[in-house]
Amino acid sequence: EENIKIDYIGGTSSGSIVATLYAAGYKPDDIYYIFKMYCKKIKYVDFKNIFKLLFGLITTGKITIDGLNSGKSIYKLINKMCNEKNVYNISDIKMPLVIPSVNMCTGEVVCFTSSKIRAFSDNTIFVNDADIGKVVQASCSFPTVFSPCNFKEDKLIDGGARENVPWREVEFL
């Protein structure tokens, strides 16, 4: 509404959806419309997973699933929308963009960026070559709600687990 020019952007979890769509070239009104259109698909609960959960609890007394939703709906939505803007890989995005996630096994922050990043002091891992759908799926993989996202040999979860607001990373773009 105020026509503020945005030079770079970052987002974690659902913020990664907004940041990615904006960086790919969608206007705020378009992003609002996309959320309204696809919200139910994103929130979809896989009833097979609920059955597995109940079956596992009854037979073993243990939780045998890693999420109520696989996260594939986010992956497909982001790929669909970004592919319409000729964005397939995070490196295809021209606007500086940072999307954090967390390695579930090591606890390391994995930051996906659209451009090379300057030196950084902590153990954050920077990746600027990844499928755009995987990037956002990983950042949105909130434990127990969404299954962890497989990326290379790692399992990634919601960036908010360690890096809720990626201001430091954006600062280094």
List PLM regions with ranges:
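Patatin-like phospholipase
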Residues: 1-12, 20-173
